Amino acid sequence: RIKHARDADRGADYTSRLMTLGTLVMLAGTVVVMLAAAPLMTALTRGWSPEKLEMATVFALWCLPQVFFYGMYALVGQVLNANGRFGAYMWAPVLNNVVAIGAIVLYLGMFGAYRAGDDLAGWTSAQTVVLAGGHTLGVVLQAVILFLPLRGLGPRGREGSEPFPISP
């Protein structure tokens, strides 16, 4: 990136290529991990009942997309940092935390707190959506909010631009 900062476009084309490659690698990795959710949960939860294993797998499927969005947060954040734009990268996790806290408050308001003796038989898909989906939404927003300050920097896909290979 530093070498390409002297280019006429200040490294925008090189940055676009890196972002394309990074996005594709993170997307592929996330798809692989999601496809492996059931075997991973089976390996990590030895001795769990089939009901608990099923719930763990469903939660994993709701939460594993966070891998992609945390990766995008890091990738876009580093591009912003390299261009001296530190604020959004620093404050984006606050948005994630506010959404996560909101999801917990919503969950407690809709379903109440855990009580001794509660079991999985009473667990609903709505509880999963609010709890796991709410936290995943926070991570998605944490990444997506960084695209606002990124827009003015210039790294974006252009027709005719080859994302591969990345040459020095």
Outline where the language-model segments fall.
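Membrane-embedded alpha-helical bundles of multi-pass transporters/translocases
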Residues: 1-168
